[in-house]
Amino acid sequence: MRTELFKITASRGQRNAIALFLLLQIPMLVFWGAQASPASTWDGLRARSGLLLGYLLMALGAQIAASEFRWRTATLTWLVTPARHRVLGAQLLTVVALGAALSTLTFTAWVSVGVARHDARTMRLDRPGELAGTFAVVVLAVCAAAVVGVAVGSLTRGPSAALLGLVGVGLLELVGDTSRFRGPVSSPLGVLAWPTSELDAVSLWASLGWAAAATAAALVALRRDLPG
């Protein structure tokens, strides 16, 4: 896991993507919803703290896994760690840890801004159970999106193919009535874009289920040999 974190910090693109996301949070926190009512401030909490982050980590996860094959570092990595599932496990743990940490940061920031603009009651500080439940949903959805990204990157073994595949599948999911907010790419949208006072439980379970299924598929795909 430390190796994977080092790779992220050493990669200019991945490092800059996270830095840009954090910088974008500043004007959003200052200006977005400055005139919003207390109800809309609470209802926007899940989307503002997790939606952009979830899809950033989905893309980042795909890049982390697929870059091993693009730059052929997988050959050396698998020689050092013959148990290939441990490499995939380290990548998954890394994006989950990153997702949990960044979710905590953004969620805390948006709650703090809501309290400053309105009051503690608006952001449910008087109802810690409800606030904790909302936080848990954000973390789960963000981490599930990140896991899907890693799995897709490991399956496709190419960053461009992984990202184009995610975008293409996501668009197809949104077209179909039965697949909208239920597929591996669009289910986090169904969780995080909804008002905080509501929860599409089917989308949440779909998001977690797809993360588990994608991980299983990636583990099976590890048996494939590397191209010569």
Enumerate the language-model features and the residues they cover.
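A generic structural signal for secondary-structure junctions
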Residues: 31-32, 70, 79, 114-118, ...
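Cytoplasmic membrane-interface segments at the C-terminal ends of transmembrane helices
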Residues: 2-14, 62-88, 147-161, 214-228
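Hydrophobic transmembrane alpha-helices of multi-pass small-molecule transporters
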Residues: 29, 99, 174-175, 215
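Active-site micro-motifs of SAM-dependent methyltransferase domains
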Residues: 7, 94, 170
